[in-house]
Amino acid sequence: MKTFGKWLVLGLVILSSPVRAALDIVITEGIDAARPIAVVPFVWQGQGPAPQQISDVVMSDLTRSGTFKTLDELSLPQRNISAISQFQAKDWANVGAEAVVMGAIKPYGEDKYLVSFDLVDLVKAQMQSGTGPQSKQEFLIDSRETVISSAQFRQYGHRISDIIYEKLTGIRGAFLTRIAYVVVKHGEKSPYQLMISDYDGHNEQMLLRSPEPLMSPSWSPDGRQLAYVSFENKKAEIFIQDIYTQSRSKITSFAGINGAPVFSPDGKKLALTLSKDGQPEIYVVDISTKALKRVTNHYAIDTEASWFPDGKSLIFTSERGGRPQIYKVTLASGKVQRMTFEGEWNLGGSILPDGRSMIFVNRTNGKYNIARMDLETRFMQVLTSTRLDESPSVAPNGTMVIYGTTYQGKQVLAAVSTDGRFKARLPTGQGEVKSPSWSPFL
């Protein structure tokens, strides 16, 4: 567990190499409370075996969301239907699910496939099944078809999941997002690797490899860039790197601490921690001009800034009250307000996208856990039950938090829903994983 005020350092070798999916989400709690949904395997309407099964991606996404649980395929009364025209409401009368999705995949030219799917309101169909003939279109929640290539199967599966999630919850799905994180493989010549992958660990890519530690990746609002800290020149420096072109620029290289960079909501600035004038303080730097604005001025340590969605205020961690707590500073006035009071320490805060709640690390009785606090009522809920949690990062739809923790003596990533009901672990094969950062909507 990193302690407050401890600073890591980095260096690098730039790489861009796709590797196998290293993260494998293991659900540990909360599936019993999820909403049941049926996913019928999409029907392959071509010759030979199907290139891929999109419905497997959809089932995994919905289950991993913590909101839904998919029914066992063998329990489905109709297992070979591809459209609502084949749907028989009477067959589904005793199925305990709120919706069913079905679809088809068929060849559509060289390396092209037409994918169609229908999302059916099963509750409505069951309620009206005994009232006489009904138009099946009344049960249809959504229906779409799209032409994709073989390389787009997983991506389009995530897209279908996003549509289903939003149609049934009213909340935008986050299955087409990515995560950045640091992998440490002890014993190797360059053990530190900055990685990005799809939210579920697939399509993993190594952006940086270094003999020195890496830390604090932060996504730009457009999802094209990462800010991070590097010690490649034997001192802390902050860089921004384009994840597609690999081009990068040095943003700060002051004496002492250059740490915890985070993009502003408009992508034009970074909030960061510098100690160039003595104690660690919060600054904001204009990315294009490199102009600096000092935000805090206190003899205690100020660090780990995070933006409010409107870009007008920051939260940050400070020891100015004697122990690490989270404070809010209004950028226009410089007014500082303490936000947290419960527990021994509170640190590493992030504001949820709706601006109403805050996720952070709470230490009580020596245990570090992820917690959520309502900014209006100040009610705090501890979301996790492990001991050494750190570095929480919130999904762009505000429903899930990914964070670092310790499992069986190794640093791993884990996830928890923002209501605390669903928990999952993202173990890896080799090395330790830490410093996760969830991308914006892509």
From Swiss-Prot:
Paired cysteines (S-S): none
Subcellular localization, as worded in the UniProt entry: Periplasm
Protein keywords: Cell cycle, Cell division, Periplasm, Signal
Pfam families assigned to the protein according to its UniProt record, in alphabetical order: PD40, TolB_N
Spans through the membrane: none
Position of the signal peptide: 1-21
GO cellular component: periplasmic space
Domain of life, per lineage: Bacteria
Quaternary organization: The Tol-Pal system is composed of five core proteins: the inner membrane proteins TolA, TolQ and TolR, the periplasmic protein TolB and the outer membrane protein Pal. They form a network linking the inner and outer membranes and the peptidoglycan layer.
Function summary: Part of the Tol-Pal system, which plays a role in outer membrane invagination during cell division and is important for maintaining outer membrane integrity.
Xref: HAMAP family: TolB
UniProt family annotation: Belongs to the TolB family.
Listed name of the protein: Tol-Pal system protein TolB
Encoding gene per record: tolB
